[in-house]
Curated annotation (Swiss-Prot):
Disulfide bonds: none annotated. One of its GO terms (cellular component) is mitochondrion. Belongs to the mitochondrion-specific ribosomal protein mL65 family. The lineage of its organism: Eukaryota, Metazoa, Chordata, Craniata, Vertebrata. The gene is MRPS30. GO terms for molecular function: RNA binding; structural constituent of ribosome. Transmembrane segments: none annotated. InterPro entries: Ribosomal_mL37/mL65, Ribosomal_mL65. This is Large ribosomal subunit protein mL65. GO terms for biological process: apoptotic process; mitochondrial translation. Keywords: Mitochondrion, Ribonucleoprotein, Ribosomal protein.
Length: 439
């Protein structure tokens, strides 16, 4: 027999009408809004990425904090210390290298465009009447001085033993270049007041450290991460002239060059370049307190392993001019870049005025002339995204200073090469109009 079901009546209270319920809801809303308005709004710090997290946002925040530290540096020495403090593996860029087509690689590393020929001379203001005109150049005297310097090392100086071919650069060409530069600077000082107060260095080191491009770390505990490509140039010109005022620019700072920079898609290891880890250096040839902190002209002497005769024996005639161009691009970029950083500029605070320097590359007989204008230091991947500026290098083909030396006679002396050296040394800083009137 089925159990009997018991139904109990459900007692319900009195319900509210729709009008009453709507009024109650409106009153509750007004009360809530008044409470929220009366409560002070909490001000929380902005949500930023962690400084120690392994993410892109955290990496960008660490970079921004480091850049803010550099911007806040009170002096140039402090800024250089922060920029060169962290030591990582970096590529060693050698200005004088036997690598094939090194000039194209160096153009990419330094964001430099190479233009054949020398730049046009800057437009000079109308000269004011001077009470005492400058003395005219005596080409015959300059030619005699250059010939005496050649004969001093090739004929007059009696050595105890015969100089081998692989020793000519160090034993003969190096003292000849020293004597030629010092003599010409002394003779041309009356024509160029900047030379009289300039500093002439012999075998003074020049260093520059910079970042260009990125790579994915292939191995190690940081495998797969994105890292910067770092470069270091340790140069040692034979002679260099430093002045207290900056040379005049050849072209405007934002001059648009129609030539594209060679793009290298391979890693620098293929050049080949090798990585080392040691202290990062940025050095122009003197300390930051030296008043002669601007470059005028460098003189570089090629080693015997890069001499023209040796390259011809190796069937590398097409690499003769490449050696000159690569040396000029790397050396002048390092020198002008160090000058710019001595003035407080760096990759995140790009230059506001161009920096200009000149170079003479020689093997003792053949001379090549180059002019360099640094227009940008923003070479990192982040800084170079919207940067149309390019560094510019002008250069000439190498020409012989003389044909041969027989006994006590220099045959086939080339006056054009000597005049070009003189023209480089006579280049002076651009003076303001007020200074011209005072003089």
């Amino acid at each position: 027999m089925a159990a009997a079901r018991c139904w109990r009546p459900l007692l319900r209270g009195p319900r509210l009408s729709l009008h009453t319920a709507a009024n109650a809801a409106a009153t509750a809303t007004e009360t809530t809004c008044q409470d929220v308005a009366a409560t002070p709004v909490a001000r929380y710090p902005p949500i930023v990425a962690s400084m120690t997290a392994d993410s892109k946002a955290a990496r960008l925040r660490r970079i921004e904090r480091w850049q803010a530290t550099v911007h806040a540096a009170e002096s140039v020495d402090e800024k250089l210390r922060i920029l060169t403090k962290m030591q990582f593996m970096k590529y060693m860029v050698y200005p004088q290298t036997f690598a094939l087509n090194a000039d194209r690689w160096y153009q990419y590393f330094t964001k430099t465009v190479f233009l054949s020929g020398l730049p046009p001379p800057p437009a000079e203001p109308e000269p004011e009447p001077e009470p005492e005109p400058e003395p005219a150049l005596d080409l015959a005297a300059l030619r005699a001085v250059a010939c005496d310097c050649l004969l001093q090392e090739h004929f007059y100086l009696r050595r105890r033993r015969r100089v081998h071919r692989y020793e000519e650069s160090e034993v003969i060409s190096l003292p000849f270049l020293d004597q030629l530069v010092s003599t010409l600077v002394g003779l041309l000082s009356p024509h160029n007041p900047a030379l009289a107060a300039a500093a002439l260095d012999y075998r003074c080191p020049v260093h520059f450290y910079w970042v260009r491009g990125e790579e994915i770390i292939p191995r190690g505990h940081r495998r797969g991460r994105i890292d910067d490509l770092r470069y270091q140039i340790d140069d040692k010109p034979n002679n260099q002239i430093r002045i207290s005022k900056q040379l005049a620019e050849f072209v405007p700072l934002d001059y648009s060059v129609p030539i594209e920079i060679p793009t290298i898609k391979c890693k620098p290891d293929k050049l080949p370049l090798f990585k080392r880890q040691y202290e990062n250096h940025i050095f122009v040839g003197s300390k930051t307190a030296d008043p002669c902190c601007y470059g005028h002209t460098q003189f570089h002497l090629l080693p015997d392993k890069l001499r023209r005769e040796r390259l011809l024996r190796q069937n590398c005639a097409d690499q003769i001019e490449v050696v000159f161009r690569a040396n000029a691009i790397a050396s002048l970029f390092a020198w002008t870049g160090a000058q710019a950083m001595y003035q407080g500029f760096w990759s995140e605070a790009d230059v506001t005025r161009p920096f200009v320097s000149q170079a003479v590359i020689t093997d003792g007989k053949y001379f090549s002339f180059f002019c360099y204008q640094l227009n940008t230091l923003a070479l990192t991947t982040q800084a170079d995204q919207n940067n149309p500026r390019k560094n510019i290098c002008w250069g000439t083909q190498s020409k012989p200073l003389y044909e041969t030396i027989e006994d006590n006679d220099v045959k086939g002396f080339n006056d054009d090469v000597l005049l070009q050296i003189v023209h480089f040394l006579l280049n002076r800083p651009k003076e303001e109009k007020s200074q011209l009137l005072e003089n």
